[in-house]
Amino acid sequence: MFAKAFRVKSNTAIKGSDRRKLRADVAAVFPTLGTDQVSELVPGKEELNIVKLYAHRGDAVTVYVSGGNPILFELEKNLYPTVYTLWSYPDLLPTFTTWPLVLEKLVGGADLMLPGLVVPPAGLPQVQKGDLCAVALVGNRAPVAVGVAAMSTAEMLASGLKGRGFCVLHSYQDHLWRSGDKSSPPSIAPLALNPPDLSEGKGCVKADTALQGAMRQLTLEEEVQQRCEEKSPSEATEDPGPGGLHVDPMDSKTLQEQMDELLQTCFLHALKCSVRKADLPLLTSTLLGSHMFSCCPEGRQLDIKKSSYKKLSKFLQHMQQEQIIQVQELSKGVESIVAVDWKHPRITSFVIPEPSPTSQTIQEGSREQPYHPPDIKPLYCVPASMTLLFQESGHKKGSVLEGSEVRTFVINYAKKNDLVDADNKNLVKLDPILCDCILEKDEQHTVTKLPWDSLLGRCLEKLQPAYQVTFPGQEPIVKKGRICPIDITLAQKASNKKVTVVRNLEAYGLDPRSVAATLQQRCQASTTVTSAPGLKDSVQVQIQGNQIHHLGRLLLEEYRLPRKHIQGLEKAPKPGKKK
């Protein structure tokens, strides 16, 4: 969660009532702490700050800081200790042990896989799925990571210590640790415990005897040396090794079997959630590019060539044999899906995968937090010509107002100066200031009254346009002028080829290169990012062909941008016409 830099929203001293509440919460969440220890962790008079921040994936986190070090953090109303706290209270949480080489992966945001656990003679601590746990390294009981158990101890042993063991939230050397004094873990000797009797059913659970023996015989240096001698660096990275950090937890299956399973998952997910009856007939290439790719789980990449089917057409033929879909060649060489049986048991029984909010991928190309559109609010700046009108309310040249504030001020000004027509309440008499501010020169001797709507409209027209952009988790940004819409155009290239050009993505917090990569996958067309001509420090995205339909769907439906901020959507190809 803190593998990358976070953004601080606020940092305030804690109130007395909040301090008492925090102390009560700590006592409830960590019952092993005595009263004196709780008071020591959450001091009564010493400085204690509440820091509200946003993690790099957008999670809102509250951090409690004492003595310059983060001691606790709160996520989704759950309280977690930091490594600084665990170094003072190493027995606060059930602690699992792993190899020192794994720490680097944990700091990078990876979860801890079960093959990376070191099983002590006393067996593994007894935990349930979802329990808060600590992770320490071989030879030192000082925890270096905090996480949540992905399964119970019994399930871990039943799985043969394979799969994901812990979702890691915070670790030594991550950015939360860096916000403190950056001290190193203390040296705490491991406890010398004898293996318990399983019949007692208490404390810890012993692992398989053969597994324990094998784990005890392994030393980190010997295994690392052996793997380095036998495998290339790229192969060694893929191998779980002592760290047990697999990119794919389904290590018991071949790559081809995994890809077959992923292909069917994306196919069923797309039919259940993305494809609609109105989309039929649907080009098979569109099914793959616009629907199946977007349903691929985070951290995984769909590659049909690595599956047993090798080609999309062969896979769809198999799905047609199962009577899930019906495929026809509506035009020569081009296949389309013409019917879908949405009542088919495989579709109705398909469970949409829900990714864990704390799950991370150790792949370099892992996705960032989902895009959230900014809140865009029109504003108005007071120009020199309108200063006389607004100075009564304390505004001066350059002051920024919302439309509702302008309306309220004009109404109050008219009433305060007795300008509302006594015979017709819908009319406002114009005093010298209003005449100078909102009337044209040729009107100043002829127009003496205006209706309310005309008065307010003219006033807004005379003010200078501005706007406020607020991105989630960031402070509002005010800029003068009108925000430029996302501009979509078609350009004619050599050989009568068309390209779709998109500009001004940056103004809405969109990364042009990320958008280009997404469109390349969705449209199955080449994309390039180039400098926008005539626009300093701005770039444009070019997509081969008329891809405005795909682009509009991406901007409107997935990114949820208002249509009024996008121009050029009307140039999308009409249904039935060749792009």
Swiss-Prot record:
Coiled coil: none annotated. Residues 224-233 have a biased composition (Basic and acidic residues). Its main location: cytoplasm. One of its GO terms (cellular component) is cytoplasm. It is found in: Cytoplasm. Residues 378-462 form the SWIB/MDM2 domain. The modification Phosphoserine is found at residues 232, 356. Translation initiation factor that is able to deliver tRNA to the P-site of the eukaryotic ribosome in a GTP-independent manner. The binding of Met-tRNA(I) occurs after the AUG codon finds its position in the P-site of 40S ribosomes, the situation that takes place during initiation complex formation on some specific RNAs. Its activity in tRNA binding with 40S subunits does not require the presence of the aminoacyl moiety. Possesses the unique ability to deliver non-Met (elongator) tRNAs into the P-site of the 40S subunit. Belongs to the eIF2D family. This is Eukaryotic translation initiation factor 2D. It comes from Bos taurus.
